[in-house]
A protein has these predicted regions:
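Aromatic- and charge-enriched surface segment that lines or borders ligand/interaction sites
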Residues: 81-134, 163, 288-290
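Ligand/substrate-recognition segments at binding pockets and active sites
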Residues: 217-219, 349-353, 361-434
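N-terminal lobe/hinge region of extracytoplasmic solute-binding protein
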Residues: 37-89, 205
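Extracellular/periplasmic solute-recognition and catalytic clefts
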Residues: 213-225, 236, 240-286, 305-311, ...
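Structural transition elements
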Residues: 315-363, 384-388
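Alpha-helical secondary-structure segments
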Residues: 111-118, 159-163, 239-240, 275-329, ...
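Detector for C-terminal structural segments
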Residues: 301-332, 386-395, 420-532
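Gly/Pro-rich hinge or "lid" segments in bacterial periplasmic/extracellular proteins
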Residues: 149, 166-242
Length: 532
């Protein structure tokens, strides 16, 4: 199993604050300039459409949400305080009090109406944002997403008071939703000023600590300059941030010279959290897969390190359904706190295969004629080169270790999604991505009746655990319920985690203050160089 140096940037930032107290430098000149290299490119900085780590990283600098995620957790940003009220009908009302000195880059005031407009726009079917579901906990979301944006439970009580009603309790609402790139405010005048407003020097307006300058047409380079009139300008350490977007191979060459390299790091790099988890789904309605022992055996014989290696260097064996980088309600990393649910160690693989054979015996499936009685077992997957290679590896290991024959069914993206979402499969490979940083983003999917429960799983005990977790007012209790829910789900082996995608990064030795959201996006405004 790979032994990478893992780093939650939040912890990294905290650990190095002591060094900061000993002495700080302003960099190589009077102006503090941060040099950053990221993999990928940027096609938009419109919060409703920014989906890649590079795009969301720029959004985090050009806009301010109600709160901002930092090394100390969620801290006030566009809002300076909020109140939360539990209503008699089970809903919750959050009242955010916006700071009066919040400004757009055109000098106008940031108001509650800007947030109302942005959130309604995000969920509107006309916008067709891939991030719309991040507001699914807001009252009226279903009606709003169906075509009536004004049904969304948000309104401006006055210019500086933004009110949100949630249909149910949502413990991660402030920390994960109100800090996200997707839910940033946008100015209606700017958005409606012209198509492609977010890429237009003429029409773009942001309210963040930085503004973009230089050549806006260059998708491989972005220069960000501190907004001197930003309310928090004194706390923004980097006066200028220069971000170059490169391929992984090219970016890796900058490790050690650039202040931060994100998405590539070379042999000595650190790996941080991303939001992607690859899983094998076993349809609960497939009668030939109804024996728990069979499903557990299929999981045990999978060499997850080898499976991850099939996909590339940025993939690692999954230790659970919730990947590294995802936080608990208490702000710690869920995986670090709860440990591995799945044994991926190379030195125990032989024992796991022996255990799998014992399970096959218990299921009455050791004899060839018994396996034949299962009929055709088909594995559905997208016919990309990487997923095809993974499917072939699984097919081979199940045949060699269990004697189980599996037929491969590779489909184009559209056909694959139709079959997956309709439950027309026995086995299926898929990837899960979270819209917000909370374990429930991976665990809510498998509640009975959830439209994303493609494996058609029904477990009453699991449903109860998830309901109790959602209603819990104790962060510690909620984390415990989610831990139990993950264990229960994986023990039934209808959802089998295979790999997680991680993000390599390298910080120059004298750099501190860089913060990751745990899902691939970064904030460099607090970047500082420690005096050597």
């Amino acid at each position: 199993m790979k032994r990478w140096k893992r780093g939650a940037a939040m912890l990294l930032c905290l650990c190095m604050m002591t060094a900061l107290l000993a002495g700080c430098g302003r960099g190589r000149s009077g102006e503090s300039t941060a040099s950053v290299v990221m993999t990928g490119s940027v096609s938009t900085v419109d919060p409703a459409y920014a989906t890649t780590p590079a795009e969301r990283t720029l959004v985090l600098h050009l806009f301010d949400n109600l709160y901002r995620w930092t090394a100390e957790g969620a801290v006030p940003a566009a809002a300076h305080t909020y109140d939360c009220t539990d209503n008699e009908d089970g809903t919750q009302t959050y009242t955010f009090h916006l700071r009066r000195d919040g400004k757009w880059s055109d000098g106008s005031n940031v108001t509650a109406a800007d947030f109302v407009y942005a959130w309604r726009r995000l969920v509107s079917p006309e916008t067709d944002s891939p991030e719309a579901e991040i507001l699914s906990m807001v009252a009226g979301y279903e009606d709003a997403h169906a075509g009536d944006p004004e049904a969304l439970g948000v309104y401006a009580e006055d210019e500086h008071t933004f009110v949100v009603t949630l249909s149910t309790m949502c413990p991660y609402f402030v920390d994960a939703v109100c800090t996200a790139a997707a839910t940033m405010p946008v100015q209606q005048k700017a958005v409606e000023g012209g198509e492609g407003w977010s890429a237009s020097r003429t029409w773009f307006v942001g309210n963040g600590p930085y503004r973009r300058t230089g050549d806006w047409s260059d998708s491989l380079f972005a220069t960000l300059v501190k907004q001197e009139d930003h309310y928090n300008a004194r706390q923004v350490r980097a006066d200028r941030i220069e971000i170059r977007f490169k391929s992984a191979a090219e970016a890796a060459k900058d490790a050690g010279t650039a202040d931060a390299v994100i998405g590539a790091a070379g042999e000595d790099g650190t790996y941080g959290g991303s939001s992607t988890v690859g899983v094998l789904l076993i349809n609960q309605m497939a009668t030939n897969m109804d024996r728990t022992e069979l499903r557990q055996a299929m999981s045990l014989v999978i060499d997850r390190d080898a499976a991850a290696g099939t996909l590339g260097a940025d993939y690692a064996a999954a230790e659970g359904l919730v990947p590294h980088g995802i936080r608990t309600a208490g702000g710690e990393e869920f995986r670090a706190v709860n440990g591995a649910v799945i044994d991926c160690e190379a030195d125990t693989y032989t024992d796991r295969c022996s255990q799998a054979l014992e399970l096959m015996t218990q299921a009455g499936l050791r004899r060839p004629e018994a396996l034949i009685s299962l009929g055709t077992v088909t594995l559905l997957y997208r016919n990309t080169p990487a997923q095809t290679a993974l499917a072939q590896r699984l097919q081979k290991v199940w045949q060699e270790k269990l004697g189980l024959s599996v037929t491969l069914q590779g489909e184009d993206a559209e056909t694959y999604q139709q079959l997956l979402s309709s439950g027309a499969f026995t086995l299926a490979l898929t990837e899960l991505d979270a819209l917000y940083n909370d374990a429930s983003a991976y665990l809510d999917l498998w509640r009975s009746g959830d439209t994303r429960n493609y494996a058609l799983i029904y477990m009453n005990a699991y449903n109860i655990l998830m309901r109790v977790a959602a209603a819990s007012t104790s962060a510690e209790a909620r984390d415990a319920y989610l831990k139990d829910a993950e264990w229960l789900l994986l023990d039934t082996a209808n959802v089998i985690p295979l790999y997680e995608k991680e993000q390599a990064y390298a910080l120059r030795g004298d750099v501190t203050g860089v913060v990751s959201d745990g899902m691939g996006a970064w904030y460099f405004g607090a970047l500082w160089r420690v005096e050597q």
